[in-house]
């Protein structure tokens, strides 16, 4: 069994970092449609996410902005990937994570793959379901904090988001150790 893991929200200034772990039940028919979530249009991501969720074992992990502030974004990213794998509750023969660094995962064989979200199908799938889940979370936060345009910026430090912080202040879900805040 091969597990792919990726995280989203690393470059954000609002909300959690979110990670997903994916193991395909069998080789999916839509495998050629998979790509790095950042390269796909929203509609395609959501369509593929629904297919991935139906055809795989998966788990998520969220690391809060408070924890990010305590342990830094790098360690929070690794913790998110580790926790997503632990939440999967499967013993995989190979775990492939996107990036340069290997989280503390208790599998026999764990490898970090630079640009893995563009190369490895399981990581592509993890990238897609993680992004769709985090984007939906930002859409929900936008209903609570509409002045920050979270539905549009998804927590990233856009000009409009930074202007909203200047005008309305920092929220409890903002990552206060980022230089922009």
UniProtKB/Swiss-Prot annotation:
| TM helices/strands, residue ranges | none
Cofactor needs:
Mn(2+); Mg(2+)
Does the keyword Nucleotide-binding feature in the UniProt annotation? no
InterPro entries per record:
RNase_HII (IPR022898), RNase_HII/HIII (IPR001352), RNase_HII/HIII_dom (IPR024567), RNaseH-like_sf (IPR012337), RNaseH_sf (IPR036397)
The cross-references to Gene3D superfamilies, in alphabetical order and at most eight, read: Ribonuclease H-like superfamily/Ribonuclease H
Top-level taxon: Bacteria
Q: Does the keyword Hydrolase apply?
A: yes
GO biological processes? DNA replication, removal of RNA primer; mismatch repair
Enumerate the catalysed reactions: Endonucleolytic cleavage to 5'-phosphomonoester
Which GO molecular-function terms appear in the entry? Answer: manganese ion binding; RNA binding; RNA-DNA hybrid ribonuclease activity
> Where in the numbering of this chain does the RNase H type-2 domain appear?
1-181
Query: Which residues does the record give as a divalent metal cation binding sites?
Result: 6-7, 98
Localization of this protein = Cytoplasm
Entry similarity comment: Belongs to the RNase HII family.
What is the name attached to this protein's record?
A: Ribonuclease HII
The record's gene field reads rnhB
């Amino acid at each position: 069994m091969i597990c792919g893991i990726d995280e989203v929200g690393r470059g954000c200034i609002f909300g959690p970092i979110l990670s997903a772990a994916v193991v395909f039940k069998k080789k999916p028919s839509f495998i050629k449609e998979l790509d790095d979530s950042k390269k796909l249009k929203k509609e395609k991501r959501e369509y593929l996410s629904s297919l991935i969720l139906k055809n795989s074992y998966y788990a998520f992990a969220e690391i809060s902005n408070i924890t990010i502030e305590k342990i830094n974004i790098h360690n929070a990213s690794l913790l998110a990937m580790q926790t997503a794998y632990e939440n999967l509750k499967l013993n995989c023969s190979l775990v492939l994570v996107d990036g340069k660094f290997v989280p503390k995962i208790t599998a026999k064989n764990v490898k970090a793959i630079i640009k893995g979200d563009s190369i490895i199908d399981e990581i592509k799938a993890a990238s897609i379901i993680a992004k769709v889940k985090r984007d939906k979370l930002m859409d929900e936060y936008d209903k609570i904090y509409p002045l920050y345009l979270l539905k549009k910026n998804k927590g990233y430090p856009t000009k409009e988001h930074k202007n909203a912080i200047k005008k309305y202040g920092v929220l409890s879900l903002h990552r206060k150790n980022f230089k922009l805040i």
